[in-house]
């Protein structure tokens, strides 16, 4: 009987040792898993923030491009409309063609003149 008791006691010690080692291994594995998850979460957050910033920047660029295209299109339509109204007025005899020959400065010409004035004022010290 003593042999059995001693054998079971040794086996019990082995099981207890294995359980302790298993518990320690599981704890270490849990810590490493937590570290890994936190690392992935942090990197994912950085990537999301960077992606959102990138998308916002591209959206802003596209909005600017669209607005420039719209302004250009509106200017073109306005110019063509004025030309057609002038043609109709001349054709119907309401206005003489010579009366329409007065050149109207374009917005670009006016902007260039304004820039030149600012440059001259800057050179002269604002006097």
From Swiss-Prot:
Matches recorded under Pfam families: Synuclein
GO-annotated biological processes: adult locomotory behavior; chemical synaptic transmission; protein secretion; regulation of dopamine secretion; regulation of neurotransmitter secretion; signal transduction; synapse organization; synaptic vesicle endocytosis
Gene3D superfamilies: Helix hairpin bin
Keyword annotations of the record: Cytoplasm, Cytoskeleton, Phosphoprotein, Repeat
Entry keyword annotation includes Cytoplasm: yes
Region (Disordered): 99-127
Keyword Iron in record: no
Coiled coil: none
Major localization listed first in the record, in broad terms: cytoplasm
Residues where Phosphoserine is found: 67, 72, 124
PTM section of the record: Phosphorylated by BARK1 and GRK5.
Start-end of each Sequence repeat: 20-30, 31-41, 42-56, 57-67
Compartment(s) where it occurs, according to its Swiss-Prot or TrEMBL record: Cytoplasm, Perinuclear region; Cytoplasm, Cytoskeleton, Microtubule organizing center, Centrosome; Cytoplasm, Cytoskeleton, Spindle
Tissue: Predominantly expressed in retina (predominantly in outer nuclear layer, also in inner segment of photoreceptor cells, some individual cells located in the inner nuclear layer, inner plexiform layer and in nerve fiber layer). Also found in brain and heart.
Basic and acidic residues compositional bias, start-end: 110-127
Region of interest (4 X 11 AA tandem repeats of [EGSA]-K-T-K-[EQ]-[GQ]-V-X(4)), residue spans: 20-67
GO cellular component: axon terminus; centrosome; cytoplasm; cytosol; Golgi apparatus; neuronal cell body; perinuclear region of cytoplasm; spindle
GO MF assignments: cuprous ion binding
Function: Plays a role in neurofilament network integrity. May be involved in modulating axonal architecture during development and in the adult. In vitro, increases the susceptibility of neurofilament-H to calcium-dependent proteases. May also function in modulating the keratin network in skin. Activates the MAPK and Elk-1 signal transduction pathway.
Subunit organization: May be a centrosome-associated protein. Interacts with MYOC; affects its secretion and its aggregation.
Family under the similarity heading: Belongs to the synuclein family.
Protein name as annotated: Gamma-synuclein
């Amino acid at each position: 009987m003593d042999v059995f008791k001693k054998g079971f006691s040794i086996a019990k010690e082995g099981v207890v040792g294995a359980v302790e080692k298993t518990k320690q291994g599981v704890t270490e594995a849990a810590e490493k898993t937590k570290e890994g998850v936190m690392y992935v979460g942090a990197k994912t957050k950085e990537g999301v923030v960077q992606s959102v910033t990138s998308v916002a920047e591209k959206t802003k660029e596209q909005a600017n491009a669209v607005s420039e295209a719209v302004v250009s299109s509106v200017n073109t339509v306005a110019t063509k409309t004025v030309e057609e109204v002038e043609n109709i007025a001349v054709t119907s005899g309401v206005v003489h063609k010579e009366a329409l020959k007065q050149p109207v400065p374009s917005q670009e010409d006016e902007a260039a003149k304004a820039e030149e004035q600012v440059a001259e004022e800057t050179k002269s010290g604002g006097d």
